[in-house]
A protein has these predicted regions:
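Edge beta-strand at a domain terminus
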Residues: 86-97, 128-186
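Bacterial Sec-dependent N-terminal signal peptides
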Residues: 2-3, 17-44, 158, 179
Length: 186
């Protein structure tokens, strides 16, 4: 009986340690992920019967100060041969047992990143939208508040947008069809 008690107690301690170690790892992943990343996510948008490939993508992950491994941010795909310059979305993201889940607020769609390598400078691996599993590569361009000099130097974000003018006589009240984003194969 005593041996059975110790075996059950040992199993409970191991299970607790496993859960607590993975939550610390999730927090570290979220901390490293925070900031702006730029590169190729192999994203395309379908619009008006045509498919357009994004030239590059910028993703800003902002960590929630009250949650250890989640936050929100922005995902912007830039295009050079499309009727628009970029497609931007607000995102909600979380890290759960090492897997990064990204939810596009305006589109109501999700992506999952589970097989990846992440350090302070580079983020690469595989992204899955539920139907396609595609390789991606991003480089870290900025991080808010790290190495901040508290009054001696400002953190400046080079985040800005501009778009082509409509030029076709359409007014700002014209309802425009949104492009549909999807992950494309290489």
């Amino acid at each position: 009986m005593k041996k059975l008690f110790y075996n059950i107690l040992t199993m409970a301690i191991i299970a607790t340690a496993t859960v607590s170690f993975s939550s610390c790892e999730d927090e570290q992943i979220a901390y490293t992920l925070e900031g702006t990343w730029k590169g190729n996510m192999y994203i395309s948008s379908y619009y008006d019967g045509r498919s357009y490939d994004a030239t590059y993508t910028e993703i800003t992950f902002l960590k929630d100060p009250y949650a250890y491994s989640s936050g929100n941010g922005y995902w912007v795909d830039y295009y050079s041969d499309a009727p628009w310059d970029y497609v931007a979305n607000h995102i909600d993201w979380k890290v759960d047992f090492g897997t990064i889940y990204i939810y596009f607020v305006e589109e109501g769609t999700s992506l999952r990143i589970s097989d990846y390598h992440l350090n302070n400078d580079r983020f690469y691996g595989w992204i899955d939208d539920g139907g396609n599993n595609v390789e991606f590569e991003l480089y870290h361009t900025s991080t808010p508040y790290r190495d901040y000099r508290w009054g001696y130097d400002e953190w400046v974000d080079d985040w800005y947008y501009y778009s082509r003018s409509r030029g076709n006589g359409a007014s700002d009240t014209t309802k425009v069809e949104k492009p549909i984003r999807y992950v494309r194969g290489k």
